[in-house]
Amino acid sequence: MTILMATDKPAERPQPKRSRKERREDSIEQILDAAEYLFSKHGIYGVTLKDVAQRVGVHTSLMHYYFADKQALFVEVFERRATVTRARRIEALDAYERACDGRPTVEGALHAFLDTDLDLYISGGEGWRNWGALGGQLSNTDYGAELMDKHFDPVVMRLIDLLRRAMPDMAEEDIFWGYHFVTGSLLLTLARTGRIDKLSNGLCHSDDFEAVKARMARFMAAGFREFAATSGAKDSEG
């Protein structure tokens, strides 16, 4: 008779073998994560496929197997998360429009536009923060501008529509300049330059997205209201 001792462990069941498709998807995700990190630190021109391969620990030939060239890899890195944040913003703006019962306010529209995105950088982990820093670099490049236009113009125009309805008497150019200042502030925030950390002697931190979320929409809404006050337009907030 065999006695099973308390210290004996039952035999572990063999793990099911991963399919070729699963292994391929895992490899691609590792490559995209590594490329995202490197692009966020050095930009597209400061990174080679060899750099990405070394960070992942694979041969460069595997990079060429999955991606035609560095440009194709960069586009894949950008679009992986761009589709997510675009869908979330559109959903948030649509939900706000339903909730406001046809009476949007500037601050309400800005909260829907900004907070939904900032939440990803608060709770989405370092990958989202790396992608945000990458996004902060794109507007100064031709390839980046094309990607931003493709993915985010519909979101921006959705916000512009709500702002027009919140301030129907505001000059069209003021609405677009207001948006320009909003997105410029957001892109600088996503870049996480660390400059505010130094200037404030550590009082503020450029990666404190919760602090940004608590302030940005209110601050920008005040700017729109100042435009309205000087032009004679009136926000639906009164």
Functional labels for PLM-detected ranges:
Residues 24, 28-36:
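Short, leucine-enriched amphipathic alpha-helices that occur as contiguous helical runs
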Residues 30, 38-80:
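Helix-turn-helix
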Residues 108, 127-133, 142-167:
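Amphipathic alpha-helical packing segments from all-alpha helical-bundle domains
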Residues 81, 85-93:
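Conserved phosphoryl-transfer catalytic core
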Residues 113, 117, 132-139, 182, ...:
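Short alpha-helical scaffolding segments that buttress acidic/His motifs in well-ordered protein cores
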Residues 78, 92-93, 120-121, 125-147, ...:
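N-terminal/domain-start segments enriched in small and hydrophobic, helix-friendly residues
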